[in-house]
Amino acid sequence: MPERDPILLTPGPLTTSRMTRDAMLRDWGSWDAAFNRLTKSVCADLVRIAGGGDAYVCVPLQGSGTFAVEATLGTLVPRDARVLVPNNGAYCARIAAILRRLGIAHVELPFAEDEPASAHAIDAALARDARLTHVALVHLETSAGLLNPLDDIAAVCRARGKALIVDAMSSFGALPIALAASGIDALISASGKCLEGVPGMGFAIVRRSALEAAEGRSPSVALDLHDQYAYMQRTSQWRFTPPTHVLAALRAALDQFFDEGGQPARGARYARNCATLVDGMRALGFEPFLDARAQASVIVTFYAPADPAYAFPAFYAAVRDAGYVLYPGKLTTADTFRVGCIGALGADEMRGAVAAIGGALESLGIAMR
């Protein structure tokens, strides 16, 4: 009898619906008109979800979300620019690492791993250093599940006349984002996160004028967003072999997203999942790492048990044997593990996950109190 697919309690890849998986059973010709129409429809819907309007365009890119982050920074940020990077986790640090490799001057503004980036502190940093031209912000820092105040920070950038580039990898589709109203210059996300597609395609939703001004700027051929967009406009095709099955799955996932009720309904389901998870884990003796005011309903970081009998690999394996896949911790200040609340899941799956975790504690002899 075949093994049942595990339920992925991770922030991507994640558990997808049967309809999304079935969409990958068809083969597509990458130059075929039907596939070109698929690309166009997906891009139009992504701009619509972001609240971009006619002033914004979507540029899809093969690869993981980080490919799209590097492509966006390398294309939109001039080499003589200076970027402020609020840093409260591993994915903020990754932006700084990309800028370093690109040779772009940047300033990291440090925050604790459980501290949302402060719009006031960002405003003060911009006031101190007139050379700063851009802010590169992670909306939802997935290393802890920490939500940064995007609207407040966008307002500061607007008031200061600074360009704002947002890594919305783990928030897009789940949390409200109004691109045009916020004045954001670029937003980056990926197929395999809160849209509930499969991994393999990133995308940037970019202010058209900013993209048009970036011709020839990227140091990369494959990661040149301007060239990718210009080629698509001329030919309706991708420059290089596209992830055809990934795009087809994303089209199916977007259809389900709209059928569910769009971002408000998707966000509400994730919030119910998160509340069910946290309540159940607290009943077992676990405590979340973050204060509830800073917690996003996408992934929750829990303190690991203090019992010496606890070791994450054995704990992970026991929960995996029960049919659920956890995510290791990514913090530098505490021993933690993470549990995702996203994917084609509801409260029943979250209760099942809590039961599996409770069973792992019992089988491994781990005391919580």
From Swiss-Prot:
Would you say which domain of life the source belongs to?
A: Bacteria
What InterPro entries does this protein map onto? Aminotrans_V_dom (IPR000192), NH2EtPonate_pyrv_transaminase (IPR012703), PyrdxlP-dep_Trfase (IPR015424), PyrdxlP-dep_Trfase_major (IPR015421), PyrdxlP-dep_Trfase_small (IPR015422), SP_NH2Trfase/AEP_transaminase (IPR024169)
Names of required cofactors = pyridoxal 5'-phosphate
Keyword terms: Aminotransferase, Pyridoxal phosphate, Pyruvate, Transferase
Q: Name one GO biological process term.
A: organic phosphonate catabolic process
One Pfam family name from the record? Aminotran_5
| Its job | Involved in phosphonate degradation.
Task: Provide the protein name.
Answer: 2-aminoethylphosphonate--pyruvate transaminase
Gene name?
A: phnW
